[in-house]
Amino acid sequence: MDFRYLPRQDLQLLIDALRQQAYRLLGPVVRQNAIVYDVIESVAELPVGIQDEQSPGSYRLHQVDSPRNFAWANSPQALKPLSFAPRESLWSARRDEHGVLSFEPCLPEPEQIAVIGIRACDLAALDLQDRHFLQQNADPAYERRRESLFLIAVNCSHPAATCFCSHSGDGPSVKTGYDLVMTELDDGYLIASGSLRGKLLLEEFSWAVASAEQRREAELQAQASIEQMQAQAAPDLSATDVLTSRLEHPRWEEVAARCLACGNCTAVCPSCFCHREIDETELGSPTTTHLREWDSCFGQGHSYIHGLTVRSETRLRYRQWLTHKFATWKEQYGRIGCTGCGRCISWCPVGIDVREELVALCEDAAHV
């Protein structure tokens, strides 16, 4: 890969170039003691020397003596809201004075958005969303939003204790799906393009080719991140197909006794796409609007059909979520539905660690 070296003080030049191309730039900022993506205009708005500490049921930030802007693992929310809107109108129906119904699609007109600071796990999750929404009959609303995104990834150098992207094969280094990719060093960044748009943008600058020493430092940084994650216990994610043969395992009852079925895990998951569709009407109005909004398979109403809640117990809902994510996704999309970001672990209010549950369920053959 043709890496250039971007001095730290020149990052503002990249931000300015994106804004001059009419992109609305989103970057990581600290809001209410968490890293979130928000509109930025200046590099001064990025976090400096901020790291995150994550563990089951816990997320906190702390300050360190470092000039780095991207020395954190991940934020509570990924890219999903930018392409798969939490709530949107799909179509409207109107009855005219003769009683004839006409239908109109409600297609968004998304603005051009650039995002800086994206992690490998979130780009991999975006690819999973693409497989769901764009294969066969493409979702037009998703497609329009997806095409409006300019993605600047930053390779992860500080994975959290909850991260396991090296086990899923999705990180910590970015592989595909970006317009630009950066690796942060103490004094600057290595930067390369991954698309024609990214290449054309880089050609506006005369940054020098990265030295062998700088490239070596980036490689060592990536290797250290991998070793940090590999040192933690994690399941063999290539063998999770066995979940479909462990449907009566007693572990489902054990985890259900702890699970609140709150849906936090699916809300922060970058790849979950469960939703519900509703119709909104107004008294006296001839128009009905058909809406789609995020839902969770942990909600009791999600499996309600024809007067029956199919998965009425938390045990059944947790089983559905885990077996779909780690087993039957392979049949649908060719891989598991998890990219190892660890958000479902950090943001679970009772600290359920999905890695522990997978080990207990997949490696115990006594209850097949």
Describe the predicted segments one by one.
Residues 236-257, 275-368:
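Ferredoxin-type iron-sulfur electron-transfer modules in oxidoreductases and energy-metabolism complexes
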Residues 10-14, 265, 293, 353:
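General structural feature for long, well-ordered alpha-helical segments within catalytic domains
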Residues 21, 262, 341:
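Single, functionally critical "micro-switch" positions that shape active/binding sites
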Residues 1-244, 252, 272, 283:
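Iron-sulfur-associated redox domains of electron-transfer enzymes in respiratory
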Residues 269:
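Conserved hydrophobic/aromatic pocket- or pore-lining residues that grip, position, or stack substrates
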Residues 24, 265, 344:
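Residue-level detector of anion-binding/catalytic polar loops
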